[in-house]
Structure formats: structure tokens, C-alpha cells
């Protein structure tokens, strides 16, 4: 599992950015387009049972990008993330969501509830890699609205060491790539900053901007000694 050295000081339960989700209509086409335009090579992920979605993983070391597509419209419509992916595709948004990683989701949940946050139940998930390895996790949604949100969800991985998606072997055009910043837009930027302060503390890994709609606006990566922006 990637370390938590990027976690802000003072957070009782460390959290860091884990991954960013990019909605695509077709996984193969989306992966080819990402590689052609940005030089980032994706690897097969797997289907999310009961969620109606499947993914391709773009490893970034401590983090990763997740190309996510709807493979069963009925199942996807029953899940909050599936609905957001469908909405993002309809609106032609390049980014749909982002996630934070923690080692103790129950502690994070208790801290947020103690601050008065009304949270839905924790959800367990899994997928099977092409090699048969099963990856399991638990997630905590924060924003329960149906549309893409600027607020990330939180994930706790329940996997053996070395199996985090970001740690997979990558063959990007310019060598290893790393996520440097997630830029989100919010109609109520002050409220969004306050929430992210509770979730992530003071961190250079995110930036909040005033916007007409809520959501992830762009991400900044570094590869081959150069900055790479996806927006």
C-alpha cells in the first residue's frame, strides 16, 4: 500500500488523495484516447459486481486514474456513482469524481459525524482483476446528491501489500507519472474548502475555485519532468 506521507499534519486519522475518476463511454476507446493525447497507458481493471460499471487503471505510484464506464445501465442507475457517471457523460465532463484513501474508515466516519456531518452508510465493494486477484474495499460517500460533486468520497482498501492499483507496473510514454493536484470547482467555494479542510487538512494536493457547477475541473500531473494537465 502506498504510504501516507502526503497526509497533512494534525489529522488524527491520515487521509491522502487516492484516485480520480474519468468517465468514458467505452473503456477501450477511452484508454486509447488517453494514451494518444496524454501518453498515459492504462491497464485492464475489472467489473464492479452489482454496480453496473467497469474500469481501466492508469497507475501513478501513490495514486491512480480510473477510467470508468457503464456496462449495465439498470445496475448503474441504482448506484450513486453510476448515476454520476451517466450525468458526466451526458454533460461531456472529462472528470467525474475523486477519492481519498484512509487506513481506518470507521475512525474517519466517527470524526465527521462528531462534527455534525450526516453521512450515508459505508458500502463494501470489490472487483476481480484479469489475473483472478480479487480487490476489496469499503467506501464512505460524503455528498449524497445525484450529480457530480466537488467533495471526494473516502476509501479504505482491504488488500494485501503491493496490490494497490497505483502500484501496478506502468509504461507511460515519458516514464513514471505522478498526481500533483486536483482542482475542483464549487458554487459555494467556502463551504467546499471547509469540508476539504476537515477531510484532507492543509494540502497542496487540492485547490478549490468558484464555479457555476460543482465537480472536479482538472487534474495536474507530472511526467518526464513536465507538467501535464487533464481538463
Label each PLM-derived region with a short phrase.
Residues 4, 9, 16-26, 54-57, 61, 66, 80-177, ...:
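Vicinal oxygen chelate
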Amino acid at each position: 500500500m502506498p504510504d501516507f506521507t502526503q497526509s497533512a499534519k494534525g489529522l488524527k486519522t491520515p487521509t491522502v488523495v487516492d484516485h480520480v475518476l474519468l468517465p468514458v463511454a467505452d473503456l477501450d476507446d477511452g484508454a486509447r484516447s488517453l494514451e494518444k493525447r496524454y501518453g498515459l497507458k492504462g491497464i485492464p481493471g475489472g467489473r464492479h459486481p452489482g454496480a453496473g460499471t467497469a474500469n481501466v487503471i492508469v497507475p501513478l505510484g501513490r495514486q491512480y486514474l480510473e477510467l470508468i464506464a457503464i456496462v449495465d445501465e439498470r445496475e448503474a442507475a441504482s448506484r450513486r456513482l453510476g448515476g454520476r457517471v451517466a450525468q458526466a457523460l451526458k454533460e461531456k465532463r472529462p472528470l467525474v469524481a475523486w477519492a481519498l484513501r484512509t487506513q481506518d474508515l470507521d475512525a474517519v466516519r466517527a470524526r465527521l459525524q462528531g462534527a455534525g456531518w450526516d453521512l450515508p452508510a459505508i458500502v463494501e465493494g470489490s472487483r476481480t482483476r484479469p489475473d483472478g486477484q480479487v480487490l476489496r474495499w469499503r467506501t464512505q460517500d460524503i455528498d449524497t446528491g445525484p450529480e457530480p460533486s466537488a467533495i471526494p468520497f473516502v476509501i479504505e482498501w482491504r488488500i494485501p501489500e503491493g496490490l494497490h492499483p497505483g502500484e501496478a507496473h506502468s509504461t507511460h510514454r515519458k516514464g513514471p507519472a505522478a498526481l500533483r493536484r486536483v482542482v475542483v470547482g464549487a458554487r459555494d467555494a467556502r463551504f467546499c474548502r471547509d469540508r476539504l479542510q476537515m477531510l484532507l487538512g492543509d494540502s497542496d494536493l487540492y485547490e478549490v475555485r468558484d464555479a457555476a457547477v460543482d465537480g472536479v475541473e482538472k487534474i495536474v500531473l507530472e511526467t518526464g519532468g513536465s507538467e501535464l494537465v487533464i481538463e
